[in-house]
Regions:
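A short glycine-rich, Lys/Arg-flanked "PGG" loop and its adjoining helix->strand segment in the class I
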Residues: 119-131
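Conserved beta-strand/loop positions that form the S-adenosyl-L-methionine
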Residues: 42
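Class I (Rossmann-like) S-adenosyl-L-methionine-dependent methyltransferase catalytic domain
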Residues: 1-37, 46-97, 116, 136-209
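A conserved beta-strand element that flanks and buttresses the S-adenosyl-L-methionine
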Residues: 105
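Alpha/beta-hydrolase fold active-site loops
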Residues: 101
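Short catalytic micro-motifs in class I SAM-dependent methyltransferases
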Residues: 108-109
């Protein structure tokens, strides 16, 4: 049902494939289902994470930000019709993120930022995590595995087909991410999250005590 709400056949097929093969969305729900705080979705794309959370019963306000205008337009159109309390805005996280108090998700976008930009984004996101809130991140981590090589290739294909507006510029390491989040006073863990995909994706789930 969720995929059918997108007018574009390309978007519909993409959503169907993601929901069928990617464990990201039910995993994010498991991380957030006990919270009642507002949610900020940085790099929200088509809004799929927000819409999935709504279907699962997440009731707090959700704000999504992305710099891909066609995706934001499609997401906002669906939100206005079906999902009250869900808002999508055009914006570039490189230029800063709004002050927010709640939980934050950053899914599959960090590799498109240079390392100093990653640090600024993560420090800002961590600052916006309220007491009892969560910061949930998924990204491809840089290591020596075959999965990382496939991840690198896949991201360049996404750019070549214009699905993504930029090519990847810097894949973070686990140590780099954990250091930033822990220095910001958050506590959490890191675990693999690749499901039926060949990509080197990991989930970082952190909270503020």
């Amino acid at each position: 049902m969720l995929a059918s709400r997108f007018e574009s056949p390309w978007f519909r097929n993409y959503v169907k494939s993601k929901l069928r093969t990617d464990p990201l969305y039910p995993t994010v729900w498991e991380e957030l289902k006990g919270t009642t705080l507002p949610l900020l979705d940085l790099g929200c794309g088509l809004g799929l994470s927000a819409f999935f959370l709504r279907h699962c019963g997440f009731e707090a306000p959700i704000v999504g930000i992305d710099y891909d205008e066609p995706k934001i337009y499609a997401a906002q159109k669906i939100a206005e019709q079906f999902y009250p309390g869900t808002t999508f805005c055009h914006g570039d996280a490189r230029e800063g993120i709004p002050d927010y108090s709640g939980s934050v998700i950053i899914l599959d976008i960090l590799q498109f930022f240079e390392e100093p930009e990653q640090r600024r984004l993560l420090e800002s996101a961590a600052h916006n995590v309220a007491s009892g809130g969560r910061l949930v991140i998924r990204c491809g981590l840089r290591d020596q595995s075959w999965r990382f090589r496939i991840t690198y290739f896949g991201d360049h294909v996404a750019r070549a087909t214009r699905w993504m507006k930029a090519a990847p510029s810097c894949y973070p390491t686990r140590e780099f991410l954990c250091e930033i989040l822990e220095n910001a006073g958050l506590e959490g863990d890191v675990r693999p999250l690749w499901g039926k995909t060949p990509f080197n994706n990991y989930l970082l789930s952190y909270s503020r005590p």
